[in-house]
């Protein structure tokens, strides 16, 4: 893909009003953290000459997203994100576009700390170009998150992580690394699309890493370098 043809669309996580999307101690709010990462990655990509957009920046729901229940509002929010991405696909060509939605995972929805951890990249089911985008992000994460990998191994000794945890959560049963799921924004967008789960918001050690400058920069480099590698290789 030619650099000048590439349209990179970064996706923020949820809304500020979405229930439960925060660490138990409320220090990390997924919607806020995701927007910070998206804005930084967007600025850096634009700085090196890539056309880059963000699907939805405000923390609050727009007038069109509002609904009688939280579920309706969430459905409207997801539809707005998909419509934004697909409008760019229609304008620039789906093969020139790519969508990277940036989230933080959670092991439970009980407002308690857990011992799960790790970085993962999700795609829709089946073999698509999204798999290639995911592979490139994983490959750069292996390099940039080496310190996180070491941190997890040490954390297993203290109980911060249980013994089954791995720094990179993958499903290699189909010959590649990406996890697969029926996420709406992956199934309904017309271009290669991935959803990146950056560690766990209900793991104390992960939250410390996510809130640190070192952690933020490592994750941003993983995503940015993965995108650039994808553009250069497809």
Describe every region a protein language model picked out:
Residues 40-50, 144, 184-191, 229-230:
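A structural motif corresponding to the C-terminal end of an alpha-helix
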Residues 59-83, 88, 146-180:
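Charged, glycine/proline-rich intrinsically disordered loops and linkers
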């Amino acid at each position: 893909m030619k650099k000048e043809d590439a349209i990179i669309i970064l996706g923020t996580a949820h809304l500020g009003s979405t229930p439960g999307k925060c660490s138990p101690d409320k220090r990390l709010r997924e919607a806020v953290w995701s927007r910070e990462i998206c804005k930084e990655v967007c600025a850096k990509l634009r700085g090196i000459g890539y056309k880059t957009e963000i699907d939805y920046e405000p923390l609050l729901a727009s007038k069109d997203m509002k609904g009688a229940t939280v579920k309706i509002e969430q459905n409207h929010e997801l539809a707005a994100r998909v419509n934004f991405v697909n409008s760019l696909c229609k304008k620039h060509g789906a093969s020139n576009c790519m969508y990277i939605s940036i989230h933080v995972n959670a092991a439970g929805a009980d407002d308690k700390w857990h011992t799960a951890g790790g970085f993962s990249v999700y795609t829709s089911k089946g073999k698509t170009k999204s798999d290639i985008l995911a592979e490139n992000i994983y490959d750069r994460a292996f390099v940039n998150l080496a310190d996180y990998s070491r941190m997890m191994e040490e954390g297993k000794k203290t109980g911060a992580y249980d013994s089954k945890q791995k720094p990179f959560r993958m499903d290699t049963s189909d010959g590649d690394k990406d996890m697969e799921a029926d996420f709406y924004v992956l199934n309904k967008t017309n271009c290669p699309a991935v959803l990146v789960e950056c560690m766990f918001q209900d793991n104390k050690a992960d939250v410390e890493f996510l809130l640190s400058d070192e952690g933020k920069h490592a994750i941003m480099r993983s995503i940015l370098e993965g995108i650039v590698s994808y553009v250069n290789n497809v």
